[in-house]
């Protein structure tokens, strides 16, 4: 019986080793790539938050002047045009540096200016660091979540909750759900646009609208 038990124990040990080896790539992804991805987003969020808070009054003032959105729309047009012409990169979360993430966060903070496309600005920044097009779109989308939540917290402190009615709360909930669905559709659409390099179409549109805005400012 001892040889049988010894053989059985040996088989179990071998199977455990096989399972551990097969499971290793998954464990590496969970403990390394995902963790690095989260850290990159956190690093990107820091400069975005600082710029967003520091430039809040400046952005509010810029929204009142038609010239500023016009200029920013033209800048967006240039960025989108560049994005289509950046060579495909191969960087995954592991290859992206924290310096890259910080600079991308700065670009998102600057994109709070009216007329600057947040997605266009951050995706162009991501592509310029060498990210794959798929990763650039996903990273741009994910990093927007803490930025949007942060902006919501800043704005919500001025809301008088005592004055809110149940209907208002329901509207906020419905609005949040709709925004989530629209966001999901947008990221799917953006993946197709970026992969097929169709940003030039939006670039032309932004250029035209920017020129119209600037013309309207001087005409008025």
Question: In which residue ranges do the predicted regions lie?
Answer:
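Single conserved hydrophobic/aromatic residue that forms the stacking wall/gate
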Residues: 1-16
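Transmembrane helix exit motif
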Residues: 14-21, 53-57, 74-92, 153, ...
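Hydrophobic alpha-helical transmembrane segments in multi-pass integral membrane proteins
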Residues: 49-53, 109-117, 150, 211-220
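Membrane-interface helix termini and inter-helical loops of multi-pass transporters
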Residues: 55-64, 157-168, 193
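Small-residue-enriched transmembrane helix starts and helix-helix packing motifs
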Residues: 73, 93-109
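Interfacial segments of multi-pass membrane proteins
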Residues: 104, 121-143
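Interfacial loop-to-transmembrane junctions
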Residues: 183-208
């Amino acid at each position: 019986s001892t040889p049988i038990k010894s053989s059985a124990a040996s088989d179990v040990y071998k199977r455990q080793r096989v399972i551990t080896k097969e499971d290793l790539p998954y464990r590496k992804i969970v403990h390394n790539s995902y963790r690095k991805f989260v850290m990159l987003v956190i690093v990107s969020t820091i400069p975005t938050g600082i710029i967003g808070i520091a430039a809040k009054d400046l952005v509010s003032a810029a929204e009142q002047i038609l010239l500023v959105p016009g200029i920013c729309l033209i800048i967006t047009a240039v960025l989108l045009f560049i994005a289509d012409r950046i060579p495909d990169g191969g960087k995954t979360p592991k290859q992206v540096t924290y310096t890259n993430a910080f600079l991308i966060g700065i670009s998102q903070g600057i994109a709070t200016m009216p007329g600057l496309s947040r997605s266009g600005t951050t995706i162009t920044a991501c592509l310029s660091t060498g990210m794959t097009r798929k990763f650039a779109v996903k990273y741009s989308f994910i990093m927007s979540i803490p930025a949007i939540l942060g902006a919501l917290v800043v704005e919500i402190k001025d809301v008088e909750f005592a004055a809110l009615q149940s209907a208002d709360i329901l509207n906020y909930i419905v609005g949040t759900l709709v925004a989530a669905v629209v966001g999901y559709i947008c990221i799917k659409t953006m993946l197709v646009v970026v992969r097929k390099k169709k940003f030039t179409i939006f670039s032309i549109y932004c250029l035209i609208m920017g020129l119209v805005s600037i013309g309207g400012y001087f005409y008025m």
